[in-house]
Amino acid sequence: MEALVLHEYARSGNCYKIRLTAAHVGAKLERCEYDIMAGETRTPKFLSRINGNGRIPVLQIGDRFLPESNAACWYLATGTDLIPQDRFDQADTLRWLFWEQYSHEPNVATLRFWFSWIGEENFNEFQRAALPLKRAAGLDALKLMDDHLAKRDYLVADRFGVADIVLYSYTSTCEEGGYRLADYPAVQAWLERVAAQPGHVPS
């Protein structure tokens, strides 16, 4: 495999999920840290060479750059047991990866960032206005996961896979955004199962 470099901000859950996937497949990552709060991903060099979208994580594969965390996780998991062989189960895995970025991360992860990085006392008018809707959408996402996991051990095909890795990252830290894991017993049990997997690494 070509050399892998993870351009990251280590505290980011999107970066952690790539490190976690790499750990499960035994891929060695070189890590390159950026201070997003200082604008290091908005420099002309970063924008022209690494990601014109000005965001991390970016997985560098040799001389090529792959933005978007779930794309990077899928790349690393390809050819391993983390992606099921069945065609429907593969599509269902993608469903969860898309859902995580569309319905889960924008709410659960955003509130973590707002409360843990910015601080409620520093919220601007937009953040204060958006907070109730973000919180409600995050509650809906966690309930959907809890209902789904009440009937099975893992998200797809009842076996551990890349969908579990991707959803583990921000779900495991949701209390930093004001959510209560105790309200979601099936999610709590699932988090414990994922963390008990061989190869698991903490954030």
Q: Could you say what each language-model-derived stretch is?
A:
Residues 1-129:
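GST-like domain detector, emphasizing the conserved glutathione-binding G-site
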Residues 53, 79, 151-152, 197:
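Structured helix-beta-strand junction loops
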Residues 71, 186, 199:
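Residue-level recognition of oxygen-bearing side chains
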Residues 85-88, 97-196:
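GST-like fold's C-terminal all-alpha helical module
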